């Protein structure tokens, strides 16, 4: 994502893929313009936030007209590097890893899982969907050309040492599905997806902030 270069707030950067997905569907449906209210209802972000987010990229919308869908689409595609393919690896082809490999990410964007790794002899050498499973012990031998992101779906007990090895191999970003809070050098970005925490948060919000 080029948002670092644009110096936009991280919260805005995180919403960009959400906007992009919706704008892409509008474009596919032949829609030519969209208002911030329509956008707001679709992506469930209030329209003032949308206008502020968009203002970081310059005046993209016109009062009473809304936003030009084609313009937004090319703008987001470029900002999110959608014209460039991003190669990703996945480590740990168990229940969760298999489900992620079977989900076709590239249908919606240009992110492709090219390699999967595991230690289980029964899985090494097989394919899940289109993705070949390699021997994790051979990571360095196989090498990671043009790969900067890893999805981590190993058991918790293996998480930290797997992350250490990924960092040594040159990975810059880890999408961590394990419950472990990873320690990594400052230049490595970790995004943590903890379903238990998300569920707990939802329970809390339902109780304390009823809609
Ligand atoms: N299954 C879920 O719904 C779920 C949901 C949220 C989070 N998680 C977390 O995701 C992780 C994986 O969960 P799961 O249910 O898929 O587990 P799993 O036991 O089914 O799969 C783990 C896989 O990792 C492999 N593995 C073990 N050590 C490895 C290593 N050092 N290097 C590479 N591969 C290795 C195993 O052979 C296995 O294939 C866990 O940390 C779990 O807490 C799972």
Swiss-Prot record:
GO molecular function, one term: DNA binding
Cell compartment(s), UniProt: Cytoplasm
Gene3D superfamilies: NAD(P)-binding Rossmann-like Domain, Winged helix-like DNA-binding domain superfamily/Winged helix DNA-binding domain
GO biological process: negative regulation of DNA-templated transcription; response to redox state
SMART domains reported in the protein's UniProt record: CoA_binding
Protein family (similarity comment): Belongs to the transcriptional regulatory Rex family.
Identification of the protein by name: Redox-sensing transcriptional repressor Rex
Originating species: Shouchella clausii (strain KSM-K16)
